[in-house]
Regions:
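Phosphate-binding glycine-rich loop
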Residues: 31-78, 92-96, 102-104, 126-135, ...
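N-terminal "arm"/small-domain region of PLP-dependent enzymes with the aminotransferase-like
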Residues: 1-32, 36, 244-246, 366, ...
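Helix C-cap/helix->beta junction micro-motif
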Residues: 96, 165-166, 324
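Conserved coil-to-alpha-helix start sites within the AMP-binding
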Residues: 85-90
Length: 407
C-alpha cells in the first residue's frame, strides 16, 4: 500500500465561509467579548435542547466546575464518575475540595450503568440518615456525573431512579454528545444539568468553549453569575459605571467572536451529523469481515463523536496506520492510571476490570464531517492493510491469532 502524501489528522473542524463571515461581522461591530451574540447563541442552544436555561462558557470543564459549585459540593463531599473518561469529569470534584469516586464502566458500551454503580455502592458504601456514605473516605456522596462516551447516551432513566433512591443529583458530561438523543428526546433537559463541549475536535466547535443546560432556575442563576467574577450584572447590560460583586466568581465567559462561530455551527449541525453517521456506517460495513476487531457499538440516538475499534496488538496496529498517513488516538487511558490520581492513593486497579480490558485494545479512528470521500477510503484501506500485515506475520510464526470472533 502506498502511504498518503499528506497526513490525515485525527480530527479537524468543519468551518465554512458562513462561519468566517459571521466572525467578520462581529469583528467589525466593535463589541468582541460576551454580549448580544453570545446571548443569541445561548437562545439557540436552549431551543435545540428544549431546556429552560442555557449558559455558554469558555469550556466544558468550566461548566462541570460551576455546576458542582452551584450544587454546593465542598470538602467532605464525593461525586461518582466513570473511571473511563477525560480528566475534566473528575478533576472538577477535586477543585471543589471533594473526592471523585471512580467507577468501572460496562464492558460493551464503555458507559457507566446502574449495575457498575451498584457494584461500587454494595462494596464501599452505606445508606444512613438519608445520605449515601463512602466508608473508605468518610465522605457523603452528593451525586453522579455520567459520561456519554463517544456520543452514546447512558441509560438516563435507570440512573435517575438510582439517584432518586439515594438522594443524589444526576448530571451529564455530554462533551462527546451534542445532538445525541435518548428515547427520541434531545439530551440537555433530562437531568439536573448537562454540559457540552465546543472544543476544536467536537461535533460542533467554537475553537474553545462549552455550555451548560438545566431546567433549574436556581442553578442557572448561580452559574450565570459565577461565570464572570460574581458580578451583579453582565458588562454589556450595565447602565451605570458602578457594579457589585455578590458571589464567588471566575473568568469563564465566552466571547461574541467565538459565539458567532457556534451560531453557524449549530445551524449546520444536521448536515454535519449526517456525515458522521454515514462515515460510521461505512466503517461498520467495510470492517465487518475483519474477524476479531470489536467494532464501534451501535447505539440509537448517537451523535457519532468517536469511532473506536478494539484490536490486539493495538500499538503496532496504530503504528502501521501512522506509517500510512492516518492519525489515530486513544480514548481513554483510565484515570486511576494517571500519575495525579495514582498519587491520591484512593483507587485500586482491582475495581476496574472492564476499564483494563478496554484500554488494552481500544483505538480511535478519524471520523468528522470535514473528511472527503478519499479520506474515508484511505482510513478503510489503511485498517485493512494493518490487519492483513499483522495477520500475515502471525501466520508466518505459526501462532493462532488471538482474536475472539466478532459478534
Amino acid at each position: 500500500m502506498i502511504p498518503r502524501k499528506t497526513i490525515l489528522p485525527f480530527a479537524k473542524p468543519d468551518i465554512s465561509d458562513e462561519e468566517i463571515a459571521k466572525v467578520k461581522e462581529v469583528l467589525l461591530s466593535g463589541w468582541l467579548t460576551t454580549g448580544k451574540i453570545t446571548e443569541q447563541f445561548e437562545e439557540t442552544i436552549k431551543n435545540f435542547t428544549k431546556s429552560k436555561h442555557a449558559i455558554v462558557l469558555n469550556s466544558a470543564t468550566a461548566g462541570l466546575h460551576l455546576a458542582l459549585r452551584a450544587l454546593n459540593v465542598n470538602a467532605g463531599d464525593a461525586v461518582i464518575v466513570p473511571a473511563f473518561t477525560f480528566t475534566a469529569t473528575a478533576e472538577v470534584v477535586f477543585r471543589c475540595n471533594g473526592i471523585p469516586l471512580l467507577v468501572d464502566v460496562d464492558r460493551d458500551s464503555y458507559l457507566i450503568t446502574e449495575k457498575t454503580i451498584m457494584d461500587f455502592i454494595d462494596k464501599y458504601c452505606e445508606y444512613r440518615k438519608n445520605q449515601l456514605m463512602h466508608i473508605p473516605t468518610k465522605t457523603i456522596i452528593r451525586g453522579i456525573i455520567c459520561v456519554h462516551y463517544g456520543g452514546r447516551v447512558c441509560d438516563i432513566d435507570s440512573l435517575k431512579n438510582l439517584a432518586k433512591k439515594y438522594n443524589l443529583f444526576l448530571g451529564e458530561d455530554a462533551a462527546h454528545a451534542f445532538g445525541s438523543m435518548y428515547k427520541n428526546k434531545m439530551i440537555g433537559s433530562l437531568t439536573d444539568f448537562t454540559v457540552f463541549s465546543f472544543y476544536a475536535t467536537k461535533n460542533i466547535t467554537t475553537g474553545e468553549g462549552g455550555a451548560i443546560t438545566t431546567n433549574h432556575q436556581d442553578i442557572a442563576k448561580k452559574i450565570r453569575r459565577m461565570r464572570l467574577h460574581g458580578f451583579d450584572i453582565e458588562t454589556y447590560k450595565r447602565k451605570k459605571n458602578v457594579y457589585d460583586v455578590i458571589s464567588e466568581g471566575y473568568k469563564y465567559n465566552l466571547s461574541d467572536v467565538l459565539s458567532a462561530i457556534g451560531i453557524v455551527q449549530l445551524k449546520r449541525n444536521p448536515e454535519m451529523l449526517l456525515k458522521r453517521k454515514f462515515i460510521h456506517q461505512y466503517y461498520q460495513n467495510q470492517f465487518k469481515n475483519l474477524t476479531g476487531l470489536k467494532l464501534n457499538p451501535e447505539y440509537e440516538g448517537s451523535s457519532y463523536h468517536l469511532y473506536t475499534i478494539e484490536v490486539p496488538n493495538r500499538d503496532k496496529f496504530a503504528n502501521i496506520l501512522k506509517e500510512q498517513g492516518i492519525q489515530t488516538s486513544i480514548h481513554f487511558k483510565p484515570l486511576y492510571k494517571m500519575t495525579y490520581y495514582k498519587n491520591k492513593k484512593l483507587y485500586s486497579i482491582q475495581d476496574y476490570s472492564n476499564c483494563e480490558a478496554i484500554f488494552k485494545k481500544i483505538l480511535s479512528l478519524p471520523i468528522y464531517s470535514a473528511m472527503s470521500e478519499e479520506d474515508i477510503q484511505d482510513v478503510v484501506d489503511a485498517v485493512n492493510f494493518a490487519y492483513e500485515n499483522l495477520h500475515q506475520k502471525k501466520n508466518q510464526k505459526k501462532f493462532v491469532l488471538p482474536f475472539p470472533s466478532h459478534k
